[in-house]
């Protein structure tokens, strides 16, 4: 199984959705082969696939991947969306030894979204160190390793909204407010999150779209559609909007994904293609990930 999945992930002749199927399957595995394949994919010519591979390594919290992720972060020839995801992955893994490189990239990386991610990752590592074991080990209700711990429980939605939308507030505090609002998930919280699609930071806007995808709330469809349609928006934000629309999956969202699967920006068109493929598997009652019997005959598949 491992060999088949690694080969499928790295086979550039495969449709992008097939490669994503392999990627999503590999992130549930551990060991040298899955790690090597994901790290190789993090330098793929598809920036969408490359950034998703780096994201997966962060979600897996695989400390063995740190040196290669640091090399990705330092490589300015790679797309900012890939460097950003490498920085976020280092923050998710959460080891103090990554702080010095994150500080270096914060100072020298030319892309604002990468700088902001480094700032977040440094703060996340520090917060993890200073937080009680019980609090830092709290699992997200959405089973994701988030770039910031949620703001402390008990803050009213209106206060969290103000924090999230405050352009003078630190990026970490705004992210913390975002995840607290996500965990609340009520109508007022969703309204606050949708409002944040208009903030100045492309990094924060992309995380807002990601969170709306986690929530799968149809109240966000119109705002996400506007983001996807905006060709002047940062590709990483449009990409997350496309994925979020795929998770909401109403008829209008599906029609829009079909339209923008032809977008000239590959990060956007491939996101739509993957989202539509996932929906197709869901409709047919099949898992998007590859599922094998206990003893798969993977050598026979290609």
From Swiss-Prot:
InterPro entries: ARM-like (IPR011989), ARM-type_fold (IPR016024), Deoxyhypusine_hydroxylase (IPR027517), PBS_lyase_HEAT (IPR004155)
The keyword Lyase belongs to this UniProt entry's keyword annotation: no
Enzyme class, first EC level, given as a word: oxidoreductase
SUPFAM superfamilies assigned to the protein according to its UniProt record, in alphabetical order: ARM repeat
Keyword field: Hypusine biosynthesis, Iron, Metal-binding, Monooxygenase, Oxidoreductase, Repeat
GO molecular function: deoxyhypusine monooxygenase activity; metal ion binding; oxidoreductase activity
Keyword Signal: no
Catalysed reactions, as listed in the record: [eIF5A protein]-deoxyhypusine + AH2 + O2 = [eIF5A protein]-hypusine + A + H2O
Comment on bound cofactor: Binds 2 Fe(2+) ions per subunit.
EC number, UniProt record: 1.14.99.29
Signal peptide limits: none
Record: residues binding Fe cation 1: 51-52, 84-85
HEAT-like PBS-type repeat residue numbers: 49-75, 82-108, 171-200, 204-230, 237-263
Residues that, per the record, bind Fe cation 2: 206-207, 239-240
Annotated SMART domains: EZ_HEAT
Cofactor(s) the protein needs: Fe(2+)
GO BP terms: peptidyl-lysine modification to peptidyl-hypusine
Pathway: Protein modification; eIF5A hypusination
HAMAP family from the UniProt entry: Deoxyhypusine_hydroxylase (MF_03101)
Protein function: Catalyzes the hydroxylation of the N(6)-(4-aminobutyl)-L-lysine intermediate to form hypusine, an essential post-translational modification only found in mature eIF-5A factor.
Similarity comment: Belongs to the deoxyhypusine hydroxylase family.
Protein name as catalogued: Deoxyhypusine hydroxylase-B
Organism annotation: Oryza sativa subsp. japonica (Rice)
């Amino acid at each position: 199984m491992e060999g088949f999945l690694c080969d499928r992930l790295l086979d550039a002749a495969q449709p992008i959705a097939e490669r994503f199927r392999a990627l999503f399957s590999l992130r549930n595995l551990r060991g040298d082969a899955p790690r090597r394949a994901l790290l190789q994919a993090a330098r793929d010519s598809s920036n969408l696939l490359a950034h998703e591979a780096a994201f997966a390594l962060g979600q897996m919290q695989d400390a063995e991947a740190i040196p290669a992720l640091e090399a990705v972060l330092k490589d300015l020839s790679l797309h900012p969306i890939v460097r950003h995801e490498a920085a976020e992955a280092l923050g998710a893994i959460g080891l103090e030894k990554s702080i010095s490189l994150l500080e270096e990239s914060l100072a020298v990386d030319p892309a604002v979204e990468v700088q902001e991610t480094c700032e977040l990752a440094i703060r996340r590592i520090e917060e993890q160190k200073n937080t009680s074991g019980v609090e830092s080990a709290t699992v997200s209700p959405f089973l994701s390793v988030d770039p910031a711990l949620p703001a402390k429980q008990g803050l009213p939605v209106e206060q969290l909204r103000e924090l999230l939308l405050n352009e003078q507030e630190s990026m970490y505090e705004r992210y913390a407010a975002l995840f607290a609002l996500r965990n609340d998930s009520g109508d007022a919280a969703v309204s606050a999150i949708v409002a944040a699609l208009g903030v100045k930071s492309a990094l924060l806007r992309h995380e807002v779209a990601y969170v709306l995808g986690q929530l799968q709330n149809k109240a966000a469809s119109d705002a996400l559609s506007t983001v996807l349609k905006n060709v002047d928006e940062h590709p990483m934000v449009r990409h997350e909007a496309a994925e979020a629309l795929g998770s909401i999956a109403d008829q209008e969202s599906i029609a829009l994904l079909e339209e923008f699967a032809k977008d000239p920006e590959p990060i956007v068109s491939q996101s739509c293609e993957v989202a539509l493929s996932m929906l197709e598997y869901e409709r047919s009652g099949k898992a998007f990930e590859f599922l094998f019997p206990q003893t798969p005959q993977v050598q026979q598949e290609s």
